[in-house]
């Protein structure tokens, strides 16, 4: 059993029957599995404002940085023009279990006018237009596709109980918030292995300026 197979069943996915009816408009690297549907948000602030209203978003960026973490947390999925499987967006999204596609080179983003175009098409996509992402395959769609929520899978629990009898090492998690830690513990992690301190200096809960971080380093 490949680890990726276990990972995929723990995420919401696009409904296979609905996805078959849609056409792929672009593809990128499948950085983090799962499915996501939402309206385009070009900034973290826009994603956060939409989340407060109960609106799901796809955060569209050329690439992400630590300053985007609050918007990344608020959105349903992440789509970047640049980046690889070890880019900031990919690493953070996988750590959170959030759908993410990176390196979508066919996408051109005009941030000034808040417009997206995809290679081979003159169609423009604006903030508020719908996108659907298949993070397991790296597919991008311009229609709202039905999703299937992930639920507790008794076979997954049974499998983990079996392999737990034979493992020879402990597993700790990367976590930046109490919510991250609680989620990891629920999946069997035994503690915290890495805490990225730079995330304390960004986002809505950050009270210490970046200069303090630089001084500390």
Language model features: what each stretch is:
Residues 1-217:
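Non-catalytic helical/linker scaffolds that mediate oligomerization, partner binding
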């Amino acid at each position: 059993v490949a680890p990726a197979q276990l990972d995929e069943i723990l995420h919401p996915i696009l409904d296979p029957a609905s996805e078959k009816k849609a056409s792929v408009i672009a593809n990128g690297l499948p950085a983090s599995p799962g499915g996501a549907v939402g309206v385009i948000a070009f900034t973290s602030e826009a994603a956060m404002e939409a989340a407060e209203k109960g609106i799901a978003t796809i955060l569209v960026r050329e690439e992400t940085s630590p300053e985007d973490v609050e918007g990344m947390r608020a959105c349903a999925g992440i789509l970047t023009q640049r980046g690889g499987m070890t880019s900031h967006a990919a690493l953070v999204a996988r750590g959170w279990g959030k759908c993410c596609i990176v390196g979508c080179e066919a996408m051109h983003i005009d941030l000034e006018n808040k417009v997206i175009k995809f290679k081979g098409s003159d169609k423009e996509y604006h903030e508020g237009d719908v996108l659907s992402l298949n993070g397991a395959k790296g597919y991008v769609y311009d229609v709202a596709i039905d999703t299937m929520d992930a639920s507790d899978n008794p076979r997954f629990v049974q499998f983990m109980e079996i392999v737990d009898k034979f493992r020879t090492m402990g597993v700790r998690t990367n976590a930046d918030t109490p919510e991250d830690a609680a989620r990891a513990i629920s999946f069997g992690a035994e503690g915290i292995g890495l805490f990225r301190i730079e995330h304390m200096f960004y986002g809505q809960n950050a009270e210490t300026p970046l200069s303090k971080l630089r001084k500390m380093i």
